[in-house]
């Protein structure tokens, strides 16, 4: 305030010059106005006298003023007024104190500025005055002080927070320091462990170097042995080349033979084609005859239908004409009656005319009668016309009848002709049926021929395939020659390569030393990386452990909460059950109270109102309390439901937590796997660190290179060995091919024989056809030989009984099971041969296990399969008068007790022998004789077939051949492979005989005892022992005794069951017999059977079973001491 007063006091003397300046400006304004009007100057200077003059001279000068003058005066007055207002404002502004102005405007400035502002406010006519500005800032200052206090308080709070955070950071830093110290300790321990491992690995490397030196010495020894083997292999390769050349020469010879065989096969194919063409021509002729017969029958049936239709039409026309005749005859009778009446009327007229002429009657009656008579005459004339017409119609009808009678006669003649034709056609139909039967039989024969041709074509295809295989084998052999040559060149180049490799090895060692230095630097960098990786892994494991502990704590808490909630739920459920029981009790009470109320109201309506109201109030209060309790219970139930919902939510949360726990567990496992992987990498890096020394690594590299060299050499040696094995296999193949070639030649010969038989049959058929044509021409020359006689004339078919298929006798396979165990056969003791009551005797021989089955499957040629759909295993048993027949038996149904005669008569001059097997009764149809002439030129493999003289229905026979060999004989690889060929399952095909056979079962074991190599071959030609059984199965089988002998001389044994055993002794063999059991009709499955073994597989006979007999003469000239062998040849 002092400053304001002092400013006011100091500014007071300064106002005087301001005022003087303001007055000067007013005077200037006045001068400007007076310049416009000079008269006003005087008035301005002396206003009072002008006014006085105007007042004095008013009446004299008022009329002299014009309108413009008045307007000028008014404008002067306005200017004066404005100037007065301005002066008043200036004066007011000058009069106001400076302090008031400062208080009004709120700032301290020079006084002139404040006065100017005040003047402007007066001119603008603003608010006259305002409040004091110095009062507001004090309130605002108080507010500012309060705000400063609040901000001070907040700053203090923030400072406290900062202090707390600072303390926390200090604590964390201390914890981190502690953890760092622990980590450093662990890392020191880890480094110590690594150093220990380094030392251990160095020791291991020292041991390895020592072992490598030993290995190098061993490898040098091996290299020496390998070089020796190389020299041997080179010599062996040269031997193989020589053998291959020899084999190629043999293959060329075989090619020539195969070409000859192919030419013969082509010739047979040409013959077959001619036979097929003839058969096709006969089929075409048969089809033409059938077509002609069909056309004739169709024409005959059409003509017959037309004639029958005509006959029916004529019958209907005859009936109509007869009806018309009957009607006309009736009309004729009527007309005759009318004629009679007319004649009577004419006679009456004549009488009347006579009377008229005489004049007997009167005119009037006469005239009436005459009129009536005229009318009658007119009617009669009309009837006469009708009669004339009827007579004409009768004439026409008679003519038609005559024509129809003529036609009916013609038709009768035609019907007679047709009946004759019908009889002729019926005869033709009979002839057609017979011809159809004949055609059917011809078709059957043709189909059989087609089947045979198909089989021949299949065999030719198989031959072509075999030829192709042989060509492929030749190509393989050529390739093997080329490969052998290449291998020899490679062996030469290998020696050069080894020398070059030694030179390159020294250079590679230098390069490896350079690489070692680079790898050491890389190892250091990788070690640094590994340390960082380990730190990260340790941190991750800590995090994983923390997360595990947190998850376990959460799980524990959640399980606790869940258990508590379950307990609470159980308690609440019990409470709820109690409350529900209470509610039901209260409801029952309410119902009883309501009933009581009703009774009470009924009984006590007449009592006092006060008592009733009090009781009612009490009861109402009770009801209200009960209702309140019910509401409380409802609320509790709602709370229980809410708690159940919460429990469900907690269970869901528990499941989610379990899932999280499982996920965290998986993460922890993954991290542990990564840790293990890192540890493995660390181990690898440690190993790399251990191999720092250049000398050790040089030795290691050299070792690896030497190992690679030795592996390369061993591989080459193995390859050479494999090639040698392949050459051995090719040798085996060639041997097998030779055997197959011989078999194929046999099959070709058999096929040629078959083709000849087929040609003979076709010629016989053609002769029979020509004969039947001749018969048909002789019987019916009008039909041009179209009819063929009955099929019984030329058919060779024999009625056979159906063979009942029975299950095979598995008990007879016991010797097979006993014979083969672990790939070797048991050796039978000689003591067992002397025991006649032994149940089972096993033929044993030793088989080498080196024969491989898959190799033999390729080499095996199966026997011919069956042509008809019979069982595949070939095990069929037939019944003969109720008794089971074994699969190898040929049934001869003759009376039991009759003997069978076998006569062997050798001729020593011509080196031949004849074998006759006859039955005594030739009168019966089942008797038979079979004879054979056996040439013997001293060779052990002479064969001859026994041709049967009588035909009987064939039954499947299963003859099993036994291959026998000396126990001490050794086998070459070729014989091993050929021996194993019988073990393939492809030989188990069913075989059906087509031709008729002798009713004798021949179980044979044939072979040559001369060569030990051929003793292992499965073919029946090359088996070394001889044992034959001729068996005739009768209707009844009685108990029988079986005799055996081990003598070298031949023996013929007859038994009680009509079996004839011809045993031909050999010094190496022991006999084979089936189990000796009495076979009765009640137990047919125990039928005795004698089986042979062919390496554990059963061979089967094919469609022809022919016996071959080999005779080897002995030193004695006696006829009974020649050794005879009967064996089966498989076609």
Swiss-Prot record:
The modification Phosphoserine is found at residues 789, 1050. It is found in: Cytoplasm; Membrane; Nucleus. The modification Phosphothreonine is found at residues 984, 992. Residues 1-62 are annotated as: Disordered. Its main location: cytoplasm. This is Filamin A-interacting protein 1-like. Residues 139-583, 610-780 form a coiled coil. Belongs to the FILIP1 family. Pfam families: CortBP2. Acts as a regulator of the antiangiogenic activity on endothelial cells. When overexpressed in endothelial cells, leads to inhibition of cell proliferation and migration and an increase in apoptosis. Inhibits melanoma growth When expressed in tumor-associated vasculature.
